[in-house]
Amino acid sequence: GWVFYTAEQMAELNGALADGTDNADVKAALADDPSIFDMYAVSTDGLMVMNVVIQNLGLVSGAVVSPQEYAEIASAEVADTLTAYGYENVTAQTTAADFAGTESCPAVAVTAERDGTALYEQMIYLKTGNYVYCVTLCSFKEDVTAEMAKLFYAL
């Protein structure tokens, strides 16, 4: 089963991300980032997390940046970000994933390790107008991100 964050917990999460690191560069980037968590859920066993982040790219970037380009940018940046949060052996590869009835969505496959625990992430990118949506599916110990993606479907 899954436990979804309440509106109050989401507000806390959106305001407290920078508290999770001592890295000044990460804190500054988070302060300037117009991204917000729209959904956050944790599996009842604590071994899986999924979230949806929405970012307003603005009129200029929103018109020219594709989800594929956004995935490529994220792939280049995610290793540094996870390393700043204490992860080791971080790999990030631009790929594609089937998601919510759409085939081959731009995505980033991530693996990392922290305190002996493996982390697997699939970051899937979608875009509507000037907004990019990143659906992050994260599992610990074993990679079940493809199975997690199947939990989403088009309405």
Where do the protein language model's features map onto the residues?
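Surface-exposed amphipathic alpha-helical segments
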Residues: 2, 129-155
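Conserved polar/disulfide-associated segments of primarily extracytoplasmic proteins
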Residues: 10-122
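A short, surface-exposed beta-strand/turn
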Residues: 122-130
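Post-signal-peptide N-terminal segment of Sec-exported extracytoplasmic proteins
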Residues: 1-13
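Stable alpha-helical elements in mature extracytoplasmic
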Residues: 4, 66, 70, 74-78, ...
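Compositionally biased, intrinsically disordered low-complexity regions enriched in proline and serine
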Residues: 3-6, 41, 71, 86-88, ...
